[in-house]
Amino acid sequence: PEEICGLIGGTKDGDVREVKELYVLENIDHSNEHFSMNPLDQLKAVKDMRAKGIVPLGNFHSHPESPSRPSEEDKRLAYDKEASYMIISIMNEDEPVLKSFRIVDNVSNEEEIEYI
């Protein structure tokens, strides 16, 4: 399957981020190894976030054939030091694995995810 991708919208209170909305966007690369978000979809998502009083928290994408950790390309393309980068691995479709990372200067650090 192709990688899925999108934006994460929510609220921030210090280091605590609460996800309120996920915006699934078109992967214009149509690839199982890469993704690029449709710029028009990104703009629409950010406008919707503003209308709802939430802020962009980061982005998400899937790894259909690899673990849920940032690839070298993911690290290289991580331009926002404040963003959360969520990756879901679907290598085992029966047990998907979701992880979130902050990436600064090509170094990734896993963030805790709390489901409420």
Regions found by a protein language model. Give the residues of each.
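Conserved, mostly hydrophobic/aromatic
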Residues: N59
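Short, well-ordered beta-to-alpha junction loops that form the rim of enzyme active sites
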Residues: S62
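Conserved beta-strand-loop surface patch within small alpha/beta domains used
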Residues: P1-P56, E65-I116
